């Protein structure tokens, strides 16, 4: 066992040879490296699988013994300063390492087929492997300096992958936006680290927590300064985990390839902020008001993310705002002191969201056969619908992921979200009401995404999106935005929706190439017998087996991973593996808990939460089920269609909600106007001041001297006698002036 821990330092470095060898190969042997590109995918999966097995072994030891192992090497030592590097293996590390490796392996297998057409295939796998290395290094770090180093590496990898198709201006802009937004949080994190080092004199977690607790108990710290440093530390987590107000980069990050969206949203970048707060929890709980601030940011993000997801037409952006809201739940749980439920939801959400993103990638992949490579078309849910019979496996997987995120038992997210919702009542009734209401909104917008994507008819084939004449009721399902006709057999969309500002929104006919992309369709390294799709279709078709295999594995995780944390500990039977894994665990709301539950109370709370989720699902079915369904015969529908004061009021509310969601809560516009616009004006003023004032003064003096010299030269006429005359005249004038002024 001791030997297992001693070799744990190798965990972050096992995936590292792949990006290094790819880089060297592309520099020295580019032709051979590109011709053997499938080999690199196999090596990436193999090395990450070794890390997964090693992490599972560590996790088994953690569950059985609940031990914590730390090993450090002294790097810089002198009388005033010491810096040590090492690794820390505890329950949090083992949980995160398993999460990163399992999701990472499945995403890599999926990517082998998804990215097979792309000339950036090798670059993609190099970035992905380095991403895994950075995240594994982050979770095994034993001090704040290591945390910050790997924190920045995780950010670099995410920026590279978000802007992977950098030839598309929108992708390059999204990369810049993610970089600038995270710079704010990362600068705060750096200041917070330096502040706590100034207070405690240590970067190591154990020493930091012990010294700081002693200072707090002896009242030897300035609480205002300590709170400021804690807020700065938390700012890093706010940016990385897309919490309000630094959340604006997350939906734009969907410009990257879909597999990286799955990895970022499930187990890497956005999970890093949750991990940081969980790691620093012993520090935060002894600082007044910081826990309240964390929970406040969490509950704002929960509600904001849900409302912004209500009217998104891009399937990946809708899932991105869903991630934002679910991360808010985790941050809320950490702020409440419910450490276990936060990590439980991190686990269950990771597999469910990975399933949803890979499912959406399968849908996008199939839609590209109809609309070509154009994300504005292939990702637009308005053009989808009726995909059930075309992509049945993807449909079932997406439905299970949707129901899990909605909180329907016995799927994964039900157990963790229900635990957070129940704990919220113990913390604050106001927060609880918001959290429970948002659970209904979550069910609504997730079911909306599912219905627009898979139910009804394939809208791209019809002259309007319902397949029939437009009706007032169907405009409800598209938030009052009328459909328009599709031209000729090539399915080129002329006009999609009529926007609120009265302008028509056109899809660009320009289709960007993906890094000089040609679809060579090289066969993936993993081949599983499956009904193949080798023909060109005029309808979407099911994805290849290499893409379906990870989806099927994630279905298993979504079905059963929730049982990991069911707090069943009665009659000598202890099935609560997560509580044993996290022992000892921080829980400010259940300080005397014995990790068991009252099943009557549990069932009562579960019925309430499932009822709220079911209500959201019903509303989504009512509004988004196609008009040609059985609902059209209900008198209830007719009451909505009728005009009148109530109808006008309802339309105003509906349009206000649509405007809020479609315009991203006007937060991006606010930043663009007051921050970005203000900075640009300041930059222009600084440029003017530098060129006209700072440079203008010496340049003006030089010009004055030049012109005075030219005047004197012209008066003198080029004769020495004239120069001597003027010289003596000036000297005489100066002497006379000196004489008269000194009388």
UniProtKB/Swiss-Prot annotation:
The reply on keyword 4Fe-4S is no
Principal location class:
plastid
Instruction: State the family named in the UniProt similarity comment for this chain.
Output: Belongs to the complex I subunit 5 family.
Which reactions is this enzyme annotated as catalysing? a plastoquinone + NADH + (n+1) H(+)(in) = a plastoquinol + NAD(+) + n H(+)(out); a plastoquinone + NADPH + (n+1) H(+)(in) = a plastoquinol + NADP(+) + n H(+)(out)
Q: Per UniProt, what is the membrane topology?
A: Multi-pass membrane protein
The annotated subunit structure for this chain is: NDH is composed of at least 16 different subunits, 5 of which are encoded in the nucleus.
UniProt name for this protein? NAD(P)H-quinone oxidoreductase subunit 5, chloroplastic
Q: Which GO terms describe its biological process?
A: ATP synthesis coupled electron transport; electron transport coupled proton transport
**Annotated localization:** Plastid, Chloroplast thylakoid membrane
Which residue ranges does UniProt annotate as crossing the membrane?
A: 9-29, 40-60, 89-109, 125-145, 147-167, 185-205, 219-239, 258-278, 283-303, 327-347, 354-374, 396-416, 425-445, 548-568, 607-627, 723-743
Tell me which UniProt keywords the record has, alphabetically: Chloroplast, Membrane, NAD, NADP, Plastid, Plastoquinone, Quinone, Thylakoid, Translocase, Transmembrane, Transmembrane helix, Transport
Q: What does this protein do?
A: NDH shuttles electrons from NAD(P)H:plastoquinone, via FMN and iron-sulfur (Fe-S) centers, to quinones in the photosynthetic chain and possibly in a chloroplast respiratory chain. The immediate electron acceptor for the enzyme in this species is believed to be plastoquinone. Couples the redox reaction to proton translocation, and thus conserves the redox energy in a proton gradient.
Q: Which domain of life is it from?
A: Eukaryota
- Quote the cellular component terms of the Gene Ontology held in the record: chloroplast thylakoid membrane
Q: What is its EC number?
A: 7.1.1.-
The species this protein was found in: Carthamus tinctorius
Q: Name one GO molecular function term.
A: NADH dehydrogenase (ubiquinone) activity
